[in-house]
Amino acid sequence: MIEADRLVSAEVLQDDEAIDRAIRPKLLSEYVGQPQVCEQMEIFIQAARQRGDALDHLLIFGPPGLGKTTLANIVANEMGVNLRTTSGPVLEKAGDLAAMLTNLEPHDVLFIDEIHRLSPVVEEILYPAMEDYQLDIMIGEGPAARSIKIDLPPFTLIGATTRAGSLTSPLRDRFGIVQRLEFYNVDDLQSIVSRSARFMGVEITDDGARQVAMRSRGTPRITNRLLRRVRDFAQVKGNGAIDGNIATRALDMLSVDAAGFDYLDRKLLIAIIDKFMGGPVGVDNLAAAIGEERETIEDVLEPFLIQQGFIQRTSRGRIATEHAYRHFGMVRNQE
């Protein structure tokens, strides 16, 4: 089982990007959720524009699917500058990054997704570029090699990562602004559902929007993906409009329950409760019991279940919490 097979995956799936780009907010005033981040960014952007400066370099981190790329686009729009986009794995050689930097216009935004995956040699190029707006390039090889400096226009680097702890200290310290994106509450997700439905030309009631929001695992990317599938259901099984009943039937058919769990989440929890008496159970035994890889459990399934309080990870193994028992209408055996 891979993350790309799951409807409730927070990672980008094949049909997400083009549709998400069409409904993506363009300005801070259109951005739903993350109120503290929006308030701070509005001040920082306004101050930079008043001074005629480039915005300070910005690091955005948090779980996947929460809007890091969207926020980078908004920053460029609010600053009235161009956005150049790339990602850590794409920048294999120092020359790849140098080519992008030398093509920037004053105050442009360079957005590097998955910045924690930059190679050390590329990262070294970034240090003087971020700090002094200079590019240090080695010309030639061996004893004849020499370093030349190229001046760069003032620019803003926006780095996005799901693993802020994987960034080296020298790189992390060069970001003047650091923003963490949190999981969204149901009210904000409901607003996102309603907004996306308008862009898609779909009629949806408040109850229908809330049903989709409740099962979206706090993640707008999942919200929009579920909405597209519910729209299909409403089109074929109803009159095209989405109300609470249609949304519930559609999501039940898709095996996404009221907590946002899919069959794999439920399979894991039921295995701990039924096969291992609620735990503790080691991850290797658990992987064998449900027929999945250890990495799938640790990297794909566990983070959300732990964050929601359904699994506790201890030194002796995984334990199903009372929350998990209540979700399935079960009572823990006290013996």
Curated annotation (Swiss-Prot):
**Enzyme group, top EC level?**
hydrolase
Q: What does this protein do?
A: The RuvA-RuvB-RuvC complex processes Holliday junction (HJ) DNA during genetic recombination and DNA repair, while the RuvA-RuvB complex plays an important role in the rescue of blocked DNA replication forks via replication fork reversal (RFR). RuvA specifically binds to HJ cruciform DNA, conferring on it an open structure. The RuvB hexamer acts as an ATP-dependent pump, pulling dsDNA into and through the RuvAB complex. RuvB forms 2 homohexamers on either side of HJ DNA bound by 1 or 2 RuvA tetramers; 4 subunits per hexamer contact DNA at a time.
Q: What's the record's remark on domains?
A: Has 3 domains, the large (RuvB-L) and small ATPase (RuvB-S) domains and the C-terminal head (RuvB-H) domain. The head domain binds DNA, while the ATPase domains jointly bind ATP, ADP or are empty depending on the state of the subunit in the translocation cycle. During a single DNA translocation step the structure of each domain remains the same, but their relative positions change.
Q: Where does Mg(2+) bind?
A: 69
Indicate the principal place this protein occupies in or around the cell. cytoplasm
Q: Which domain of life is it from?
A: Bacteria
Record keywords: ATP-binding, Cytoplasm, DNA damage, DNA recombination, DNA repair, DNA-binding, Hydrolase, Nucleotide-binding
Q: Where in the cell is it found?
A: Cytoplasm
Q: For this protein, what reaction is catalysed?
A: ATP + H2O = ADP + phosphate + H(+)
> Recorded E.C. number(s)?
3.6.4.-
Q: Which GO terms describe its cellular component?
A: cytoplasm; Holliday junction resolvase complex
Q: Can you name this protein?
A: Holliday junction branch migration complex subunit RuvB
**Gene name in the database record:** ruvB
> Which residues does the record give as ATP binding sites?
23-24, 65, 68-70, 131-133, 174, 184, 221
Region Small ATPAse domain (RuvB-S): what ranges?
185-255
The UniProt record gives the binding positions of DNA as 294, 313, 318
Lineage runs: Bacteria, Pseudomonadati, Pseudomonadota, Gammaproteobacteria, Enterobacterales
UniProt xrefs under Gene3D superfamilies:
1.10.8.60, P-loop containing nucleotide triphosphate hydrolases (3.40.50.300), Winged helix-like DNA-binding domain superfamily/Winged helix DNA-binding domain (1.10.10.10)
Q: What species was this sequence derived from?
A: Photorhabdus laumondii subsp. laumondii (strain DSM 15139 / CIP 105565 / TT01) (Photorhabdus luminescens subsp. laumondii)
Q: Which family does it belong to?
A: Belongs to the RuvB family.
